[in-house]
């Protein structure tokens, strides 16, 4: 089967936004306009398409699929058909893991901002993640019809708050209820959309006289940015004072793909204006899979290799989301980086070292799913029938194994005990929790060895709340939830040199003998545990050295102060001794464990607590209350800023343990007019009085 759309005409994009910026409406309109251009299966007449839109509007759809495929020929039908795969990204900070996961498989992104609210805290988190994965992006300022809408204010905020380099390629005609359309700065024509056809038809008209100066000024800025793409263009621009349309588009495209600039557009999705021009910008400026560097991975021998976005390459893909579908069961969404695969083929899950047969392959479209026989480089699809795969796994050709760059998922910072309400819920709860943990790698489930309770851990109170709610809605499990517990850690602040660990046991017959000497020192934050074998002259035989390491690793799970996991330490195994008959692995494991415990006591152990980056948006009148309250929670205020449309943003770093129930107290502090977001920042040493309270609470 030949490829329907050349890979150069693929666009794998995400649409990302703060909760209220209007992402769903924007995405919905994209599906509507692309659906009008290209119908899958039977071709409807215009009226039926409109009906579909209306009925979807009544239901207030959100795309439930993790990836949806649409087609676009340009708003004037002037492009060859392009295939746009839209990957859904959530808009809440507790789910940044979801955003991170989708950023990993995107080639480009549309960042949607509210013309009134501007750049909000969540927008910054998403922007940072897009920077981390070097995702080229566009900015779309939505809700231009709302009271207080201001395109140029959002432009300033993108520069100041995100340190972005936005380049407007359109300028709005009017704002608020007078928002009429946009001026296309590349064509220097105004675009007015036809309201009767819900924006599917439009006219190019002359620029309104009152906007002529503004447009001239912004066009000059845009052309200058384009000219900076190369020396030749700059010379051409200096000679002629302008550049041809094709040169401008190509130069802006090159600079967008290099992440140097972000083309900026605007509109109102709700009123059917502007999304059409944004889709053209996706084609003009965002990369196809062949425009970005090939994906890198690791071969079996540990060497680095890359896989080019080509059908001729060996097959490689990444599973990026797992969903449970009421009709077909578990769906694994995967992004194909190279090669071709057919339903029925055997794949290797190289992350887990297991082979599996690929069952059905589904492609999701706006309002229906299509079963397909094969997928090729650049495609995004869902697989049915893969039992082993979880988020972040590489699925590849069994004859050519490769593990693509692994996704790094954050450690949970909060945990709660959950108990089923009835005996019948017990079994269902186990199944439900496992299924949810499979879908979401930042959610963990374990059993507390001492109490036998089931403990769930995640990225924040809301994260756990939503998972418990899903357990009830999707799996019918009623559960009671304990008080949230903070995930503390232990580490050391000084070095303990040459500490002995000796395990000797003589009890008739063969004894036990293991002796290890270690030096323990602090490691860099986030580096975890490192072990260095510095044994000389065979004082400990080679085969027993891994046992010492294993003994230490077992002990790391429970520190000497209050039994919290130990992080960021280096251990040097420097000396030891053995007995020809009595030494064995177990004895050296015990010796390693004893040496580590003793060394840790001597190395100034401390308790670490998770610190959260908290941002509060509040009207100015309540500023004093909010700041005082944050200080009372051991918070350190790190800055304040004015918000678009009045109000203040307070940024602070606050220990997680002090933030429980914060939403309730913020509501009363600011009479329900303040909002906040919170995300994990780093671990920090707990002050002595706090650490003492934590240790004594743990020992009760």
Swiss-Prot record:
Coiled coil: none annotated. GTP binds at residues 17-24, 88-92, 142-145. Residues 8-290 form the tr-type G domain. GO terms for biological process: ribosome disassembly. One of its GO terms (cellular component) is cytoplasm. SMART domains: EFG_C, EFG_IV. It comes from the Bacteria. Keywords: Cytoplasm, Elongation factor, GTP-binding, Nucleotide-binding, Protein biosynthesis. GO terms for molecular function: GTP binding; GTPase activity; guanosine tetraphosphate binding; translation elongation factor activity. The keyword Electron transport does not apply. Transmembrane segments: none annotated. It is found in: Cytoplasm. NCBIfam families: EF-G, PRK12740.1-5, small_GTP. Belongs to the TRAFAC class translation factor GTPase superfamily. Classic translation factor GTPase family. EF-G/EF-2 subfamily. HAMAP family: EF_G_EF_2_B. Catalyzes the GTP-dependent ribosomal translocation step during translation elongation. During this step, the ribosome changes from the pre-translocational (PRE) to the post-translocational (POST) state as the newly formed A-site-bound peptidyl-tRNA and P-site-bound deacylated tRNA move to the P and E sites, respectively. Catalyzes the coordinated movement of the two tRNA molecules, the mRNA and conformational changes in the ribosome. This is Elongation factor G 2. It comes from Burkholderia orbicola (strain AU 1054).
């Amino acid at each position: 089967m030949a490829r329907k759309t050349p890979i150069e005409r693929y666009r794998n994009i995400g649409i990302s936004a703060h909760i209220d910026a209007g992402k769903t409406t924007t995405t919905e309109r994209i599906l509507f306009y692309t659906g009008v251009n290209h119908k899958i299966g039977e071709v409807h007449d215009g009226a039926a398409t409109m009906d579909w839109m209306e009925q979807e509007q009544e239901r207030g759809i959100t795309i439930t699929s993790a990836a949806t495929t649409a087609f676009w020929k340009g708003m004037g039908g002037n492009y060859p058909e392009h295939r746009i795969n839209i990957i859904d990204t959530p808009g809440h900070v507790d789910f940044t893991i979801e955003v991170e996961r989708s950023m990993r498989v995107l080639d480009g992104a549309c960042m949607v901002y509210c013309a009134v609210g501007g750049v909000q805290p969540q927008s910054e988190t998403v922007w940072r993640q897009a920077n981390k994965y070097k995702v080229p992006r566009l900015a779309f300022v939505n809700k231009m019809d709302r009271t207080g809408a201001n395109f140029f204010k959002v432009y300033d905020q993108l520069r100041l708050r995100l340190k972005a380099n936005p380049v407007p390629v359109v300028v709005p005609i009017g704002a608020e209820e007078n928002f009429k359309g946009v001026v296309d700065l590349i064509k220097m024509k105004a675009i007015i959309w036809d309201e009767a056809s819900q924006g599917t038809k439009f006219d190019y008209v002359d620029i309104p006289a009152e906007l002529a100066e503004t447009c001239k000024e912004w066009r000059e800025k845009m052309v200058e940015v384009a000219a900076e793409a190369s020396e030749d263009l700059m010379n051409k621009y200096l000679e002629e004072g302008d550049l041809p349309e094709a040169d401008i588009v190509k130069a802006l495209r090159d600079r967008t793909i290099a992440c140097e600039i972000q083309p900026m557009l605007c509109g109102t999705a709700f009123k059917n204006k502007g999304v059409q021009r944004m889709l053209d910008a996706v084609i003009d400026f965002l990369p196809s899979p062949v425009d970005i560097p090939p994906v890198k991975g690791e071969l079996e021998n540990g060497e680095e290799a890359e896989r080019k976005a080509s059908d001729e390459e060996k097959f490689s893909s990444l599973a990026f989301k797992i969903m449970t579908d009421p009709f077909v069961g578990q769906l694994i969404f995967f992004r194909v980086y190279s090669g071709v695969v057919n339903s029925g083929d055997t794949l290797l899950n190289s992350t887990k070292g297991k082979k599996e047969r690929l069952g059905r392959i589904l492609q999701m479209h706006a309002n229906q799913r299509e079963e397909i026989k094969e997928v090729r480089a650049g495609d995004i699809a869902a697989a049915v029938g893969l039992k082993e795969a979880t988020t972040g796994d590489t699925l590849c050709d069994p004859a050519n194994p490769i593990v693509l760059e692994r996704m790094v998922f954050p450690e949970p910072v909060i945990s709660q005990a959950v108990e089923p309400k009835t005996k019948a819920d017990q079994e269902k709860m186990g199944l439900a929790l496992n299924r949810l943990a499979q879908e979401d790698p930042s959610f963990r489930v374990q059993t507390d060895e001492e109490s036998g309770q089931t403990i769930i851990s995640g990225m924040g109170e809301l994260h756990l709340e939503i998972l418990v709610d899903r357990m009830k809605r999707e799996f019918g499990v009623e559960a009671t939830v304990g008080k949230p517990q903070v995930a503390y850690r232990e580490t050391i602040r000084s070095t303990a040199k040459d500490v002995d660990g000796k395990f000797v046991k003589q009890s008739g017959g063969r004894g036990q003998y293991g002796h290890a000497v270690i030096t323990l020192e602090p490691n860099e934050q986030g580096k975890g545990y490192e072990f260095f074998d510095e044994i000389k002259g065979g004082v400990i035989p080679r085969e027993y050295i891994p046992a010492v390491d294993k003994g230490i690793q077992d002990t790391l799970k429970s520190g000497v102060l209050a039994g919290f996991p130990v992080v960021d330490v280096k251990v040097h195994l420097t000396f030891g001794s053995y007995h020809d008959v009595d030494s064995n692995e177990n004895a050296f494991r015990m010796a390693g464990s004893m040496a580590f415990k003793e060394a840790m006591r001597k190395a100034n152990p401390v308790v670490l607590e998770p610190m959260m980056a908290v941002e509060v948006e509040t009207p100015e009148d309540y500023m004093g209350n909010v700041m005082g309250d944050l200080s009372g929670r051991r918070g350190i205020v790190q800055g304040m800023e004015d918000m678009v449309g009045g109000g203040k943003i307070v940024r602070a770093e606050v220990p997680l343990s002090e933030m429980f129930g914060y939403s309730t107290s913020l509501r009363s502090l600011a009479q329900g007019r303040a909002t906040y977001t919170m995300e994990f920042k780093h671990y920090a040493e707990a002050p002595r009085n706090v650490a003492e309270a934590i240790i004594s609470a743990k020992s009760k």
